[in-house]
Amino acid sequence: MTFIIHFKDGHREIYSNRYDEDVEHERDAAWDDVYATFPNADYIEEF
């Protein structure tokens, strides 16, 4: 899955992981992964 990570200072990053977005428990794991990787993110959106 791919996410756009927004930070409070205005910059953004794209982050991808290898979870299958069509499988619910993998989609949940992908979100857990991105939140753990970017704990200081202001906003995270799925791309």
Language model segments and positions:
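A short, exposed loop/beta-hairpin motif centered on an aromatic-Gly-Thr core
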Residues: 11-25
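Amphipathic alpha-helical segments in structured regions that serve as interaction surfaces
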Residues: 3, 29-30
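A short beta-strand micro-motif
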Residues: 1-8
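Short, mixed-charge low-complexity intrinsically disordered segments
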Residues: 31-47
